[in-house]
């Protein structure tokens, strides 16, 4: 089919609305929002859909936070995620090197303002969440849907009727965790800040803000990997590299790095890594590696 027609047959995706209103609690980021939603809908909850995120909590996010959220939509099976452009969007693309300039920008702006969702638009599926209900999240298992509040405990293998949850059981065995075990205080061996999910300048700024004046634990190996050369240069221009160096960290060259165990950036078998990446599958960061997905803020703490 592809060789004969130069086309890939695709079905038109369904549309889904995820509306989140209210104000997010302190230290709750777009990554936490993504993990929370996936934990509620499951890793297959968005299968066959294109997801639109909306609501006051979404509008209050920075562009980089919105990118993180849309990036993670694939982790619940969606084809992709989008957010209606607004003034935050327009300001973000006003000054970059390759953005339209002057009259071209104004002409483009008029077109961008037309990219809106009709007030009476219909969706195949709709979900509504309160921002105030979303806590700081972390995964404990082997897919992004196995996420819980960082203050919570690992789920029980058996439900109230005594039936064994095979997915929970398998995840606990691989992760070396037990039912009822607290996630707060869980030992980690590695920390990874980076990936297409959380390797932006805003992520580095947040991480540096928290670790400034502190010292990295000598028992933790940390990889701080900017998402691009542009992010690396911006971090150096802002002095973020100096803050990290004084705290015992260092900026590495941009790339995928430990997100998928690229090159030498591998987590050894049986070791735990808190990671800002988007996937925590078995062996994702190296054979036998154990991954906790979290935000840059949580990773810094």
Predicted regions mapped to residue ranges:
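Fe-S-dependent hydro-lyases/dehydratases of central metabolism
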Residues: 1-301
């Amino acid at each position: 089919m592809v060789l004969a027609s130069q086309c890939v047959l695709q079905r038109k995706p369904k549309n889904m609305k995820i509306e989140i209103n209210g104000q997010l609690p302190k230290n709750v980021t777009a990554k936490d929002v993504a993990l929370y939603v996936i934990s509620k809908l499951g890793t297959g909850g968005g299968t066959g859909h294109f997801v639109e995120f909306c609501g006051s909590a979404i509008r209050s996010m920075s562009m980089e936070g919105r990118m993180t959220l849309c990036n993670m939509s694939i982790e619940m099976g969606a084809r992709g995620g989008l957010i209606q452009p607004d003034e935050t969007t327009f300001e973000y693309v006003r000054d970059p090197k390759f953005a339209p300039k002057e009259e071209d920008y104004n002409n483009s702006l008029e077109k961008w303002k037309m990219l809106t969702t009709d007030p009476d638009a219909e969706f195949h599926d709709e979900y509504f969440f309160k921002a105030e209900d979303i806590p700081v999240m972390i995964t404990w298992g082997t897919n992004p849907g196995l996420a819980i509040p960082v203050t919570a405990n690992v789920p029980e293998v058996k439900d109230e009727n005594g039936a064994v949850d095979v997915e929970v059981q398998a995840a606990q065995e691989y992760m070396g965790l037990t039912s009822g075990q607290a996630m707060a205080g869980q030992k980690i061996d590695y920390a990874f800040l980076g990936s297409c999910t959380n390797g932006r300048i805003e992520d580095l700024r947040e991480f540096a803000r928290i670790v400034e004046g502190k010292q990295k634990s000598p028992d933790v190996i940390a990889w701080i990997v900017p998402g691009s050369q542009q992010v690396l240069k911006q971090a150096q221009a802002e002095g973020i590299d100096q803050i990290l160096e004084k705290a015992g960290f260092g900026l590495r060259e941009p790339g995928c790095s430990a997100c998928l165990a690229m090159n030498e950036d591998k987590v050894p078998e049986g070791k735990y890594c808190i990671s800002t990446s988007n996937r925590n599958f078995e062996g994702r960061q190296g054979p036998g590696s154990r991954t906790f997905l979290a935000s840059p803020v949580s990773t810094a703490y």
